[in-house]
Amino acid sequence: MLLCLLIAGCSTVPVQEEAGLKRATAEELASLLRQREAAIHTMKGLFSAKVRGGLIPISTRVEGAVYYRRPNAMRLRGFTPIGGELFEFVQVDDLYMLRLPTMGKVLTGRQLEMGEMGKLARPFELSVWAMGGVLGTSAIGKDETMKLVEEGPRYRLDVFGPRPGAASTDSQLLRRMWFDRRTLLVVQEERVNGSGETDASIQYEDFRSIGEQAPAATGNPDSRLLRPFKISLEDGRGQGSVQVTFHEIISNQELKNEDLGRVSGRPSPPGSAS
């Protein structure tokens, strides 16, 4: 009888959501992304990259530096472990420049055309996506829509945008972001191509504060400058993977124009780097 009472008593207890999990709407998550993007005006960092499967065929280990100025100026430099220069990648607005001194090549063009530049430009396209997790540049655009899905301890935010050349009402999936519901930080992201296939999968780990707390007016502890110091990227095309580990990240200190490099020269003809 006592056992029956205990069982009956247990059955009346409602299932509780796991302690520590936060609730949020799609709009609230989008607001957090905007706050995190606005929190960084400039950034510079030192990192190491480990490469598998020929994603960056010029080296299997790269020591690098990144410079960024909001809203859209970035420079990546890569070196061998003994200090030899491997590459310089500069992005300004919708233009880019890729210099490969060991190969005697300089490629320039528009970001949307990077896929036409062959295997050399692909790793740097992926690197820009990976760095977005540190810079907070994955904010939802004005012409993008969202769908929120609850997946246990995570939220998945699907982001849709207009399909190129299609009617304004026709949209396609652009990317997915997974938020840890304990912290509401983005811990995983997938970029999706026009065919609906995964173009790249990115994992974000080892979050640390890189600056002072954001203005108290936000009233949200997650608005602090918490950024991932470890980024793991899998190329959806099966060309390999890259793991970036930051040694140092400094935010919101003045950068000189020469720190950011420049894009010069005419765009390279498509296919010239294949």
Give residue ranges: language-model regions.
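Sec-dependent bacterial lipoprotein signal peptides
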Residues: M1-C10
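N-terminal leader/targeting segments and the immediate start of mature chains
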Residues: C10-R61, S264-S274
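Edge/loop elements at the starts and ends of beta-strands within beta-rich repeat scaffolds
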Residues: Q35-M43, I56-T60, Y67-N72, E150, ...
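One face of beta-strands
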Residues: M43-A49, V62-V66, N72-G78, E85-F87, ...
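A mature extracytoplasmic/lumenal domain signature
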Residues: A49, N72, G78-I82, D93-L95, ...
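An acidic-aromatic
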Residues: R70-A130
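C-terminal low-complexity, charged extensions that often adopt amphipathic alpha-helices
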Residues: G109-V149, R266-S274
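Gly/Pro-enriched, hydrophobic low-complexity segments
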Residues: M146-P267
